[in-house]
Amino acid sequence: MFARLSRSNKFLPIALGVGAASIATAIILQRNYSIMNDTSKAFLGDNEWIDLPIIKIEKLSHDTKRFTFALPKKDQVSGLITASCILAKFVTPKGSNVIRPYTPVSDNGTKGKMELVVKHYENGKFTSHLFGLKENDTVSFKGPITKWEWKPNSYDSITLLGAGTGINPLYQLVHHIAENPEDNTKIHLYYGNKTPEDILLKSELDNLQKKYPDQVKITYFVDKAEGNFEGETGFITKDYLSHQAPKPSEKNQVFVCGPPPFMKAYSGPKVSPQDQGELTGILAELGYSKSNVFKF
């Protein structure tokens, strides 16, 4: 019996070798699958511009529209992560490139299309061009550019301060976190606008708050209330935040996005896309540190 066992053991290295080879093959196949799977993403982070046609234009307010673009393939996703943006470009009649960053509001997992919510600025070169387009016209895009790579449960809570179209990257965060059953991060959004009609993505935000009432808390602020508006009238004040928002803590991260005057008032401006600059304004006065505040 012992002799038989001894003879059978001599095949053990061969068996182990075959097993190791099988594992190695599986790993290689998995890697190849991952690489091949990248083709299901429209944007791969390279330097290639992709022309996407407009398939739908929806008016959201007197100066804001939602543009829906078709991705190159119906089974593709955009390739963006939370939180990231893409670059949009058009070429002027004289051959100059006009490039602007935009944060899609469509879900990262949405196939075949991508949505942008854009506000028209009277002297804005890109927005004036975009608002002059119609369905089937194309816009060039490339990216994505990662601004902040969100990791579930990195914080107990996040505080979001936004105004106008600054809601776009904030909505991306709210939607991504709330719809992830594994992410328990509490969300506190304070969103300011001129009138109730100017509140962008309100139905989407309200639906998330209704669906996840224990996780998502949203407070709207308007300069002038009308009708049955549910929210606050006036600015998002220092006093309001000191009493209602989560206290400064390493367990609470703040994200800010809005027009320049808004950024100046609450966090101070960014120096550049790569340089957050110093933390000033209301958040600094409330005791938040630079490491606890991110400016989109």
Curated annotation (Swiss-Prot):
One of its GO terms (cellular component) is mitochondrial outer membrane. CDD domains: cyt_b5_reduct_like. Signal peptide: none annotated. FAD binds at residues 154-189. It comes from the Eukaryota. Its EC number is 1.6.2.2. Keywords: FAD, Flavoprotein, Membrane, Mitochondrion, Mitochondrion outer membrane, NAD, Oxidoreductase, Transmembrane, Transmembrane helix. It holds the Pfam family FAD_binding_6. The chain crosses the membrane at residues 12-29. Its cofactor is FAD. One of its GO terms (biological process) is ergosterol biosynthetic process. It is an enzyme of class 1 (oxidoreductase). Disulfide bonds: none annotated. GO terms for molecular function: cytochrome-b5 reductase activity, acting on NAD(P)H. Residues 47-151 form the FAD-binding FR-type domain. It is a single-pass membrane protein. The keyword Mitochondrion applies. It is found in: Mitochondrion outer membrane. InterPro entries: CBR-like (IPR001834), Cbr1-like_FAD-bd_dom (IPR008333), FAD-bd_FR_type (IPR017927), Flavoprot_Pyr_Nucl_cyt_Rdtase (IPR001709), FNR_nucleotide-bd (IPR039261), OxRdtase_FAD/NAD-bd (IPR001433), Riboflavin_synthase-like_b-brl (IPR017938). Belongs to the flavoprotein pyridine nucleotide cytochrome reductase family. This is NADH-cytochrome b5 reductase 2. It comes from Kluyveromyces lactis (strain ATCC 8585 / CBS 2359 / DSM 70799 / NBRC 1267 / NRRL Y-1140 / WM37) (Yeast).
